[in-house]
Amino acid sequence: MRQAFRRRGIDARSCDLKPAEDGEAVYHYHGDIFHFLPKTPWMWDLDLLIGHPVCRTMANSGAKHLYLGMRKENGPNPARWAELEAGVEHYKAVRAIPARRKAIENPVMHPHAMRMIGMGKRQFVQPWWFGEPFFKATGWELENLPGLSPTNKLTPPKPGTTEHKAWSAVHREPPGPERAANRSRSFIGMCEAAAEQWGAIILADAMEAAA
C-alpha cells in the first residue's frame, strides 16, 4: 500500500509490528503505532490514515470460538471474550487517530463485534474487482472517502471447479507459521486502486490548500 501511494508522489509511510518486507525501512516504522504517535508530531496531522487493526477475534469466521467447545449452548468462553474486547478497543484506538480522511480495514464481522465497535460507513471489495483472480472480502470503514471503484472486474469461476479452488487459496491456506501473515496480506490490485483513487483526492486537497 505504501509503495503504491509513493509511486504517485504522496509521502506515504507505514507502521507495523513486523519489518518492512520491501527493505524500505526509511519509510517504515517498525513497532507499535501507539509507541510512535507521542514521539512523532507529524503523525497528528495526517491527510489520510489507512489502518489495519488486528481483526482475528472480530471475524465472523471465528465467532464460534466465543463459546466453550465452540458450541453456543456450552456458554461463553471468557478468555475469548476478553480477547474480543481487547481487539475492539484496539480497533477503536486506531480509528480515533486524528486524520482528515480515514479508511480502516476490517473483516466480515460477527454481530457482537459490529455492535461493540459501532461500525460506520463500510464498503466490501474483492481482489477480482481489481484484476486479481482471488476471493477475499476486504471491508473498509470509510470517513470522508468514497468507496473504491472496480478497475478490472473479472468473472468469478463456478463453485466446485478447479479454478474456483485456486481462487479460494486464501481460505484454503494450510496451518503453519506463515498462515496468518499470508491470509492478511493486501492484494496489489486493490492497493493500486486505493492509491489511484484516494491518492487523487489527497493530491487535490494539497493543491487546494496551497492555492
Language-model regions: role of each:
Residues M1-A211:
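Conserved active-site and SAM-binding loop architecture
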